[in-house]
């Protein structure tokens, strides 16, 4: 197994529900470690830039509107197979397909308001981490 980093967002609906701690606890209880975190209020430009790959898709505008509707918590998670493990913890993007016990089954409100975002690959993780974190803002933790 490889130690890697992945990127995670706790989205506005989950922040509004005051479940940040519960979500972080799920990550940490499965061996992922938070090595970077920031609470942010995205601007429209930041949200559009982050989700640029979805520009032109039918859900793009509603996704951007949702992501700027309230604060978010962006974080870098580290651990063995962090990308895969985070995606398992989050559950399916579509709430209808999210298995019981996953973050989305527990906290999502809809397809768009699905509580969390996580990188889909190591390459995406590197790009997404760099979008929100400068050099020196992510720290390796002693285990």
Swiss-Prot record:
Keyword Transferase recorded: yes
Catalysis performed (reactions): a 2'-deoxyribonucleoside 5'-diphosphate + ATP = a 2'-deoxyribonucleoside 5'-triphosphate + ADP; a ribonucleoside 5'-diphosphate + ATP = a ribonucleoside 5'-triphosphate + ADP
Enzyme class: transferase
EC number annotated for this UniProt entry: 2.7.4.6
Organism: Sodalis glossinidius (strain morsitans)
Subunit composition and interactions: Homotetramer.
Annotated family: Belongs to the NDK family.
GO CC aspect terms: cytoplasm
A Pfam family the protein falls into: NDK
Coiled coil start-end: none
General function of this protein: Major role in the synthesis of nucleoside triphosphates other than ATP. The ATP gamma phosphate is transferred to the NDP beta phosphate via a ping-pong mechanism, using a phosphorylated active-site intermediate.
NCBIfam families per record: PRK00668.1
GO-annotated biological processes: CTP biosynthetic process; GTP biosynthetic process; UTP biosynthetic process
Keywords: ATP-binding, Cytoplasm, Kinase, Magnesium, Metal-binding, Nucleotide metabolism, Nucleotide-binding, Phosphoprotein, Transferase
Name of the protein in question: Nucleoside diphosphate kinase
Gene Ontology MF: a single term: nucleoside diphosphate kinase activity
Record's subcellular location: Cytoplasm
Binding of ATP, residues: 11, 59, 87, 93, 104, 114
Gene3D superfamilies per UniProt: Nucleoside diphosphate kinase-like domain
Active site as annotated: 117
Entries under CDD domains matching the protein: NDPk_I (cd04413)
Reported cofactor(s): Mg(2+)
Keyword Repeat: no
């Amino acid at each position: 197994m490889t130690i890697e980093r992945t990127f995670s967002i706790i989205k506005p609906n989950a922040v509004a529900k005051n479940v940040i701690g519960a979500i972080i606890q799920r990550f940490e209880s499965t061996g992922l470690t938070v090595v970077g975190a920031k609470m942010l209020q995205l601007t429209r430009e930041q949200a559009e830039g982050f989700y640029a790959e979805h520009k032109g898709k039918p859900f793009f505008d509603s996704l951007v509107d949702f992501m700027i509707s309230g604060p978010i918590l962006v974080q870098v998670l580290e651990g063995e197979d962090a990308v895969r493990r985070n995606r398992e913890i989050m559950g399916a993007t579509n709430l209808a397909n999210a298995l019981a016990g996953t973050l989305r089954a527990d906290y999502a409100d809809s397809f768009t308001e699905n509580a969390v975002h996580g990188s889909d690959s190591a390459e995406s993780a590197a790009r997404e981490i760099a979008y929100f974190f400068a050099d020196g803002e992510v720290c390796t933790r002693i285990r």
